[in-house]
Design a protein with these regions (language model features):
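Beta-strand-rich modules
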Residues: 42-61
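Aromatic-Pro/Gly-enriched surface loop or interdomain linker
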Residues: 11, 56-145, 198-202
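A glycine-rich, often tryptophan-bearing local segment used as a flexible ligand/cofactor-contacting loop or short
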Residues: 146-221
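Extracellular low-complexity, O-glycosylation-prone stalks/linkers
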Residues: 12-29
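Conserved aromatic anchor
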Residues: 1-13
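Solvent-exposed serine/threonine-rich low-complexity stretches and specific carbohydrate-binding patches
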Residues: 28-36
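Short S/T/G- and acidic-enriched coil/turn segments that sit immediately N-terminal to beta-strands
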Residues: 35-41, 68
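Conserved hydrophobic/aromatic "anchor" residues
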Residues: 6, 16, 27, 51-53, ...
Length: 221
């Protein structure tokens, strides 16, 4: 089976509602849980089954907007692939998200992973140590348009990622502002530049490539 876990938010609540989906788009009826519950287990799922979940809070007769959509595929433990959602800017900045809705970007990433089991986690759980990177052979780290204010990789994350890669891990990073945050002409610290250049092994050229098309190198993905 699969287990979904969420943090104990500091607000008045009478319960939670979990919604499950096979594709991250169409969700079934709510599964009602008590306000003291912070995990939900979807049991007896065969190997290879994919599920996507979102959670809402119930209190004072109203239901909150749903959480981000996270998914997983049943397989061996620990999962070969860990999807890390580091895209907070979209959720909290009005200019990025005028409707105030939560996102399903991590779910789309899960759907693109063909074959191996995967789990999805918020980057805060990686920072806290609740979900370590080390057991997973591959990590997909999503940053969207995270930049200087929200930070693409903060000091704690840089250390965790560097240690993971030095131990032989494999990392795929997706983000539009990583180079600007960590290696633009002025602003980044020496530690940020070092991480970008020697750990991520990237080279910052300009703030805008002026294209949405690219061709991978022969030895690339």
């Amino acid at each position: 089976g699969l287990t979904l876990a969420w943090s104990n938010e500091d607000f008045v609540r009478t319960g939670y509602r979990v919604y499950a989906s096979d594709d991250g788009v169409t969700f079934g009826p709510p599964i009602n849980l008590g306000g003291h519950m912070h995990t939900f287990t979807d049991p007896n799922l065969p190997v290879g089954t994919e599920r996507y979940y979102r959670v809402s809070v119930v209190g004072s007769g109203v239901e909150s907007k749903p959480s981000r959509i996270y998914g997983a595929r049943v397989g061996r433990t620990p999962s070969p692939v860990l999807v890390v959602d580091g895209n907070d800017r979209w959720s909290f900045q009005t200019s990025e998200n005028p409707a105030g809705a939560n996102h399903g970007f991590a779910a789309l990433t899960g759907r693109s992973i063909s074959g191996p089991a995967f789990d999805t986690v918020h980057h805060g759980a990686v920072i806290s140590g609740a979900v370590p990177l080390s057991p997973h052979p591959a990590v997909v780290w999503l940053l969207g348009e995270e930049s200087t204010a929200d930070e693409t990789f903060d000091a704690a994350e840089r250390t965790l990622v560097a240690n993971y890669l030095n131990a032989g891990g494999n990392l795929f990073v997706s983000g539009a502002e990583i180079g600007w945050h960590l290696d633009r002409a002025s602003g980044p610290t020496a530690a940020e530049r070092n991480f970008y250049r020697t750990v991520l092994r990237a080279a910052y050229v300009a703030d805008d490539a002026n294209t949405y098309a690219f061709v991978p190198t022969g030895a690339g993905i």
